[in-house]
């Protein structure tokens, strides 16, 4: 396998890296952790101004019309900066679902607003603490209304619309719907999770208006398709975060002295850093393969 990013994609990576270096230090993430804010509006607005929220949205709907590989390089830099923004929920999941499975009218209605950051979207799948499966989806859709409960929903408190996974009572198939979270009969409760860096919410739908999306006969396969694509992008975020952690550990090992020597000069510390480096590079290789499958539509993506 001979895979690498193009020069244009590397330039995009550098542009995003510079913006985040200048505007998203770790102090920004700490501020979100220690406050009632759900995300950094300043960093989000900067990403919007760069056009990144419309990276993979077709140009006809106001996006940049780029692809999965461009999103991969953006994701790596977001992870490196631990950027406290709803990018994964809104771009990797919500927007991607509409691009793939929205009707023409739904694309015309929602994508331009998502491209310019006027709206934030999320993906509402789980209903319990267990792994979501086709069998445990209890939220129902019937006659343009949905009823049920989703928990936890990442970035559920700050999102404007949600792609909600439901069971269509007309045919008993799993389907996707679009719900305006600001409308009546939608209740949201912010919840605490093991990850305080992300906003999570419980969302309750009580005869809420919903738009049925066009998943054809795919059913649960459509959900797997969206999640598999997002998993590759999240892997790139994790690579960026892991590499940043390694660099921080290396800098500390060179700056910290014990018994008159840099602790980085001790073999045990060198081994720890070397092990971290090897694991990161292995993860990078796997992620690059995932990016290639994502770009080419290969069958190995689901693996």
Language model feature labels by segment:
Residues 3-12, 52, 80, 186-281:
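Glycine-rich beta->alpha junctions and the first turn(s) of the following alpha-helix
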Residues 139-141:
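A structural signal for short hydrophobic beta-strand segments in well-ordered beta-sheet cores
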Residues 9, 20, 74, 103, ...:
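Residue-level signal for inorganic ion chemistry
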């Amino acid at each position: 396998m001979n895979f690498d990013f193009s020069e244009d994609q590397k330039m995009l990576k550098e542009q995003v890296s510079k913006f985040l270096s200048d505007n998203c230090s770790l102090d920004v993430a700490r501020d979100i952790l220690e406050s009632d804010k759900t995300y950094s509006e300043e960093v989000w607005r900067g990403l919007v101004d760069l056009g990144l929220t419309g990276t993979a949205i077709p140009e006809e709907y106001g996006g940049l019309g780029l692809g999965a590989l461009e999103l991969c390089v953006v994701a790596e830099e977001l992870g490196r900066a631990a950027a406290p923004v709803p990018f994964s929920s809104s771009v990797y999941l919500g927007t991607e679902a509409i691009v793939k499975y929205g009707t023409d009218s739904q694309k015309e209605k929602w994508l331009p607003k998502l491209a310019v950051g006027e709206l934030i979207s999320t993906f509402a799948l789980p209903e319990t603490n267990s792994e979501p499966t086709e069998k445990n989806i209890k939220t129902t859709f019937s006659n343009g209304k949905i009823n049920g409960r989703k928990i936890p929903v990442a970035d559920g408190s700050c999102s404007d619309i949600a792609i909600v996974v439901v069971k269509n009572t007309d045919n008993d198939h799993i389907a996707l719907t679009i719900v305006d979270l600001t409308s009546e009969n939608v209740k949201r409760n912010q919840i605490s999770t093991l990850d305080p860096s992300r906003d999570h919410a419980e969302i309750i739908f009580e005869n809420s208006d919903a738009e049925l999306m066009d998943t054809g006969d795919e059913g649960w396969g459509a959900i797997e398709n969206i999640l598999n694509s997002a998993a590759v992008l999240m892997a790139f975020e994790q690579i960026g975060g892991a590499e940043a952690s390694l660099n921080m550990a290396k800098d500390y090992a060179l700056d910290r002295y014990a018994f008159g020597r840099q602790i980085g000069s001790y073999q045990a510390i060198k081994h720890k850093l070397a092990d971290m480096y090897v694991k990161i590079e292995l993860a990078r290789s796997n992620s690059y393969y995932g990016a290639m499958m994502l770009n080419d539509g290969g069958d190995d993506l689901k693996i």
